[in-house]
Amino acid sequence: MISKAFFVRGDFQDCDTKGKERVVILLTVLCLLLGFLYAVIGYADFTVRHLSSTTLAFTNDLCAAYTSGSLVKTTWSGRAPFPTYMIALSTIIRSILFTMFGGVGMATLPLSLIFAFKNRPKCVTTRAQYVKVMALQEATDLAKRSNELKTATLGLQREERGGKKGRKFRKNVKKVQQADTSWALTVRNLALSIIWLLHIIVFMLVNPPAFPFLNQVFIQLDSAWGLLGTTTFAIFCYYLVMSVISGEMHLGMRLLLLSIHPMK
């Protein structure tokens, strides 16, 4: 047993050493890449208006710039501080990932609940229907979920007749109502996805924006009651975050230097 323990420990040490080497190599490559990009594109460009005029005698009510005949737009460039450059670069990368995962999640979040409701345990009356359902779904999972639902329903009936409504009763109620809750969440998520999509189209993709839409809705709700607009805004933001998580779980991706795998 002791020799085996030393063998396992040695194997882990070897893996740990290789992992540290990979981390050092990855950090070195990232530092070199960031330094190169900062040296090449680490500038901030500002569009300014250039005014030029001849020199005139200055009085209390006259400035030479007011009589200038040329108005030229030019660009002024300056070296950006390294922290500002890092923030801007990370913002660009996060915006791309946010757009990808959020777009996928807005579709998968309601669809996953729709499929969960569609594949819920159903009452099987004939042998032909039973064979058809078992051919389309996993037999073990369906039978287990159906038995659990049947047992919970019978337990509810017994406890309701006996007047006992403890923790077990509430747990069984939750199991029985889970399918209906899934359908209600599906309708809610689908509505939120459609509203977000409409807002992106009419306010962000159209230039100039055609209509403020959600911005105006939040303002009106906030004027109706102090916390109503804030609460609604928080719900929409929370749904957007959940959409990004759902998109990452279903999509996953492989970048140039690292991989982002679907979560489990």
Curated annotation (Swiss-Prot):
Tree of life domain: Eukaryota
| GO cellular component: a single term | membrane
| Keyword terms | Membrane, Transmembrane, Transmembrane helix
Where does this protein chiefly localize? membrane
Q: What topology does the record note for this protein and the membrane?
A: Multi-pass membrane protein
Pfam families xref list: LMBR1
What residue intervals traverse the membrane? 23-43, 96-116, 194-214, 225-245
Q: Which InterPro entries match?
A: LMBR1-like_membr_prot
Q: Where in the cell is it found?
A: Membrane
Per the record, the similarity remark reads: Belongs to the LIMR family.
Know the name of this protein? LIMR family protein SELMODRAFT_416716
